[in-house]
C-alpha cells in the first residue's frame, strides 16, 4: 500500500476528522484514507492497548500522519458524554465519520438499559453527533457522515417502533439492519434540521456494498460455511475498495445533505450516488425516530 491520496479523496490539509471504530475494519481504512489526505485524524476505540497497533500501522504507511487515539465506547452513554466533554471545547471538528459497528449474536442489555446493537450502531452515534455539534459548528465546512449498510433496506424495510429493542423477538441480522436504517434516517433528518436552522452542516451517508470484513462474519455469531466464504470471495469487495464510498461521502466537495453514496453495482464498484431506501424517506417516521432517540439517550437537538 502506498501513501498516495486516493482519487475519491480531496486534500484534508488543516482539517480535523473524528472516525469512530477507526482501529479496525472499514473504520481503519477510513482513518488511513483521511490520513493519506493529510487530515488530523482522531481514532476512537473501546480498547486503547489493542488499537495502538492499528494506529502504528497507519503511521508506518503514512509517516507524516497526524493520528491519535481516544477512548470511546458507543454502547455506553456515559462513555459518550465523557468523550464529548474532552473534545467539544477543543479544536473545531471538520468531519465526523460514524463508522463503528457491531452485531451482537444474542440479545444483550447495556448499563443504560438499551439493546446493545442498537446502542452501539445508532443511539451512541446519535448522542455523539449531537454532543459534538458545538465543535463541528466552529468549522467553516462541517460534515457528518453516517455509515449505513445495504441491510438497511432488508427485512422489514422500516423501523419497527413497536419492538425497537428486540424485546419480543431478537434477531442479530434484523437488529443490525434496523440500526443501519436508523443511521440513514438520522443522516437525512440531521441535514434537514441543520438547513432549517441556517447551519452550514452537511450530513450524508454511505454504504460499502459487500465488504470482506470481520463484521460480515459476526452476524450469526459463528464462522460462515465454506459455501458462504466462497461466495464472499467472488462477490465481496476488499475493504480498501469498499471504503471508497465512505471516503467519497466524507470528502466530496460537491456533496449535499441527504446524499447517499455506495458502489455503482450495489455490491461492488466505483463510489456513486445511490438511491435512498423508501423507508428512510418517510418524514413522519424520521421525526418519530428522532423523538424516541432523544428520549432514550437524554440528548437533545440544541443548534
Regions found by a protein language model. Give the residues of each.
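Alpha-helical packing segments of well-folded alpha/beta enzyme cores
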Residues: 54, 186, 242-245, 289, ...
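A short C-terminal helix-loop "cap" of Rossmann-like NAD(P)-dependent dehydrogenase/epimerase domains
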Residues: 166-167, 222-231
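Rossmann-fold NAD(P)H-dependent dehydrogenase/reductase core
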Residues: 1-217, 295-303
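C-terminal amphipathic/interface module of NAD(P)-dependent oxidoreductases
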Residues: 278-303
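Short, flexible, mixed-charge acidic loops at enzyme active sites
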Residues: 157-164, 218-223, 261-270
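Short acidic, glycine/proline-rich loop/turn micro-motifs
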Residues: 109-110, 271-277
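Pocket-edge positions in alpha/beta enzyme catalytic cores
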Residues: 43, 72, 234, 278-281
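C-terminal helical subdomain
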Residues: 179, 229-273, 283-287
Amino acid at each position: 500500500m502506498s501513501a498516495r491520496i486516493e482519487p475519491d479523496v480531496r486534500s484534508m490539509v488543516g482539517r480535523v476528522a473524528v472516525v469512530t471504530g477507526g482501529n479496525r475494519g472499514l473504520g481503519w481504512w477510513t482513518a488511513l484514507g483521511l490520513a493519506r489526505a493529510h487530515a488530523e485524524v482522531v481514532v476512537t476505540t473501546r480498547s486503547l492497548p489493542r488499537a495502538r497497533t492499528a494506529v502504528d500501522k497507519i503511521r508506518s504507511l503514512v509517516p507524516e500522519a497526524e493520528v491519535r487515539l481516544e477512548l470511546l465506547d458507543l454502547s455506553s452513554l456515559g462513555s459518550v458524554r465523557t468523550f464529548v466533554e474532552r473534545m467539544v471545547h477543543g479544536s473545531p471538528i471538520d468531519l465526523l465519520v460514524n463508522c463503528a459497528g457491531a452485531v451482537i449474536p444474542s440479545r444483550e442489555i447495556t448499563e443504560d438499559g438499551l439493546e446493545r446493537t442498537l446502542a452501539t450502531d445508532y443511539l451512541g452515534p446519535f448522542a455523539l453527533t449531537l454532543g459534538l455539534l458545538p465543535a463541528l459548528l466552529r468549522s467553516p465546512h462541517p460534515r457528518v457522515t453516517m455509515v449505513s449498510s445495504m441491510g438497511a433496506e432488508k427485512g422489514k424495510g422500516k423501523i419497527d417502533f413497536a419492538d425497537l429493542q428486540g424485546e419480543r423477538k431478537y434477531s442479530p441480522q434484523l437488529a443490525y439492519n434496523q440500526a443501519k436504517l436508523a443511521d440513514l434516517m438520522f443522516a437525512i433528518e440531521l441535514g434537514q434540521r441543520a438547513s432549517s436552522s441556517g447551519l452550514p452542516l452537511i450530513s450524508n451517508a454511505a454504504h460499502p456494498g459487500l465488504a470482506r470484513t470481520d463484521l460480515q462474519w459476526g452476524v450469526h455469531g459463528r464462522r460462515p460455511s465454506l459455501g458462504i466464504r466462497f461466495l464472499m470471495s467472488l462477490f465481496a469487495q476488499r475493504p480498501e475498495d469498499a471504503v471508497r464510498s465512505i471516503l467519497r461521502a466524507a470528502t466530496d466537495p460537491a456533496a449535499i445533505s441527504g446524499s447517499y453514496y455506495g458502489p455503482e453495482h450495489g455490491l461492488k464498484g466505483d463510489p456513486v450516488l445511490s438511491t435512498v431506501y423508501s423507508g428512510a424517506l418517510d418524514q413522519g417516521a424520521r421525526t418519530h425516530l428522532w423523538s424516541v432517540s432523544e428520549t432514550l439517550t437524554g440528548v437533545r437537538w440544541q443548534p
